[in-house]
Amino acid sequence: MKDIWSQQGRIALERDFWIAVMKAQRDLGVPIPAEAVKDYERVKGQIDLASIAKRERVTLHDVKARIEEFSDLAKRQFIHLGLTSRDLTENVEQLQILRSLKLVHFKAAAALLALAKQAELNRDLMITGRTHNVPAQPTTLGKRLAMFGEELLSAFTRLEELLNRYPVRGLKGAVGTQLDQLTLLGGDNGKVDQLESRVLKHLGFRASLSAVGQVYPRSLDFEVVTVLHQLGAAMASCATTLRLMAGAGLLTEGFQEGQVGSSAMPHKVNARNCERICGFGTILGGFVAMTTGLSGHQWNEGDVSCSVVRRVALPDSFFAIDGALETFITVMRQMEVFSAAIAAENERNLPFLATTTILMEAVKRGAGRETAHEAIKEHALAAAKALRSGSGDADLLARLAGDRRIGLGKKTLQAILSENVRFVGAAPHQVDAFLAEVHPLARKHRGAADYQPARLL
């Protein structure tokens, strides 16, 4: 990702673009000597950022400085024929975006496969499901991970859809009419279309905009950043829950040999990587706000008020999602689940976790739903208070068995609790459904299943 967005990398892309346009123009009849093309190709790798910056301090125009630099190196003046600055910058920036999206696409597939592996490993591990962060009903850890995985998969699908249709601006000139290329090519619309096709092929895009002005719609930038935010949001939600579980001692994101959790408290094992993922999500949300400010504010055929925002928001959005993906994959590979602690939490909460099942069994045996609901609520709240305060009757089962409104004896209630495996409902099958959607990604994206992220600091 760093290579795609580096200044050196961008200038290399620009020079390749100029040469591709020059070759196409020459093939279509523009009088450009073959030796001139070779001269540009010979020096295209000689990128002197200091020299370009020196020129820009004089011209106060970044593109003009880069034109002069490249032309002086080649000792020729055949690049940028019939082009405006935006013919260069828009197309090259969109190429950077396209390549970045493809890299994100691969790493998102790797993230989904890593998450799916954990979901499969923990398919049947019953945990205490929580709503409002309060014990609710049993689920499985695999289902919890699949829940967040499904959100990530939805974002991944949206990313694929965007990649399949993302259009490039193309060579459209100062206001989008292609006037200068038409003039250069003798007014031949067919040749202009051929030039456009050659540029499209060089850049690797499937489609170009046909009626665009000087700039492509900035709502496209918004669409790009929002899909990155959606990917980040799914990972951040998962990371938030892993942080909560780590705080309860139910799992760890991984703790490496020699790692220190706190400079003051030697015992600390913090979920620092999960916290980092959440931080990246916040950053991406900020860039969504920035690109929102660009959408719907184009003046006529275009202006450059968007430039300063885009120079920050676009590369940094990709750096943020790249960091989030690298960190998320690392967490999925290194996390360790403490099944004994999970079992202890289940045992502590089990009578309360079974209340909806008890309610349904009571209704099946003829109890009125609202009557039984009120009775179970009264006993559950009283038992919970007694349990937490250390005084009073905390035996929820005995309380329920003694209430005629519910109509279930102690043996029946004990039998219900003994079948606690069924309390997770369809969770294992839902995990299987998620896995069936994700596993094909390993075939479609070779290397994604085995992708090893860089070592995190």
Would you name each region that the model predicts?
Residues 1-178, 187-200, 261-262, 272-276, ...:
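A helix-coil-helix interface module used to build multimeric assemblies
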Residues 2-6, 51-53, 259-279, 301-316, ...:
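Short beta-alpha connecting loops at secondary-structure transitions
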Residues 15, 60-63, 108-115, 145-159, ...:
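Alpha-helical transition-metal enzyme core signature, strongest for iron centers
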Residues 120-142, 252-268, 301-309, 333-353:
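Glycine-rich cofactor-pocket loops
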Residues 143, 222-230, 357-365:
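Short, well-ordered beta-strand elements within core beta-sheets of diverse protein domains
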Residues 197-214:
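A short, charged helix-loop
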Residues 215-250, 254, 259-320:
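A conserved active-site cap/scaffold subdomain adjacent to cofactor or substrate pockets
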Residues 283-369, 375:
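Long, amphipathic alpha-helical stalk/connector segments used for oligomerization, subunit docking
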